[in-house]
């Protein structure tokens, strides 16, 4: 088959460094992956092309790149999958990380986030002389986050990191969950307290991008939601994120639908005047245009609200 690649390149040593695209048209076997095609280009067409790869078997996580605007491991992405009709395949370096050259990014940003969550066991007691035996059922819950290969695809896809590079990010938070949920670790409370701060677990916008691009099914966003549950179960409820959850649940349980005005007020805090004033005009314009339900005492119950309330009550009784 004939493959068409459009590679975004960058040479820091050029007279005028800057990103540009370069097209390659090559003949390759039908079974080739995007990585196979890139290696073919580097070996036979253009030895100046820089890329990072190693195992070529979806194990090491080295070859994460952006293919047609989606973060992927290029070693497991077949050309026929992304270009079934011979379309041009756009290959770019990962997003949200500094490009060193061509398709190679600086991973210091990624590893800095991982180090920030202290990704190692901190036993609650003295280190045992023998093996620390953990219950099977406790460890089964950790199989998913332990499958992470640190490829960084989720970091590349994270929409929060695009606008706020202080956010810990999906990979680091998924790794944090792996130790918070480990019964052998003795610092769960301190870990949760740290993750409860700004740029931690509450800054995720639940866009699902990290879930979609993860090649190992770790589903970082779901791990972040479990961290939020653990934070609240640990009694840390005096944050905007925790208040947002409680206000949302209270509104739907009592009226059958969301009181968006009180959600904002409760989340920021009724006495947080600067935040409330900063959002007042937005709320007013939304209300005038009919896009905001009547707030507070004017927020009427929906028909069937009692049934919704019973669902909430039944769920709470099971907890």
Model-derived regions: residue spans:
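Residues in well-ordered beta-strands of folded domains
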Residues: 6-8, 27, 76, 90-94
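Short strand-turn-strand beta-turns centered on an Asx-Gly dipeptide
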Residues: 27, 67-70
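Short, structured protein-protein interaction patches enriched in aromatics and acidic/basic residues
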Residues: 50, 55-64, 249-254
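Structured interaction patches on ligand/partner-binding surfaces of diverse proteins
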Residues: 71-84
